[in-house]
Amino acid sequence: GLKPTHVFMAFGSNDLETYGSNSSEFIAAYKTQIQKIQAALPDVPIYINCILPITDDAIAATPDLAYYPEYNDGLQTMCQEMGCTFIDNSSIIESSSENLYEPDGEHVIQDYYPKWLTHMAQVAGLQA
């Protein structure tokens, strides 16, 4: 079977539409997945990616998206409780000279992904 040395997880904005203001239910579902991984891979570090900022236009179109900061707060607390590392990727969006959003203002374009991969590797100490 697979023997990963690091696990990276990213659930996010699509779940905001499912859970709405109920971030605690989202966190509970996330914890369940992490517990399964920790049971199977007890010595493997787990990294949890933030939910990226969402544009005002996207929030106006889908008000439940406005809860993303609350979800990120819950993810940070969950990481502290479970011994995981929270990765805040918002600086990738905020520091970019280009608009990295799809027209929906919620999802990102292809150019985001190499930047994201590099950032995750840096946080995990996987890149010189």
Label each region the model flagged.
Residues 40-42, 82:
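Helix C-cap/helix->beta junction micro-motif
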Residues 25, 29, 67-70:
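Alpha-helical initiation/capping and key positions within long helical/coiled-coil segments
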Residues 1-3, 33-39:
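Short amphipathic alpha-helices and their capping/turn segments at secondary-structure boundaries
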Residues 1-25, 52-55:
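Oxyanion-hole/transition-state-stabilizing segment in secreted/luminal serine hydrolases
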Residues 30-35, 72, 76:
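Generic structural signal for well-ordered alpha-helices
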Residues 5-11, 45-50, 85-88:
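Structural recognition of the beta-strand scaffold that forms the well-ordered cores
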Residues 29-30, 41, 50:
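Internal catalytic-core helix/loop-beta-alpha segment
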Residues 52-128:
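Catalytic His-Asp segment of secreted/periplasmic serine-dependent ester chemistry enzymes
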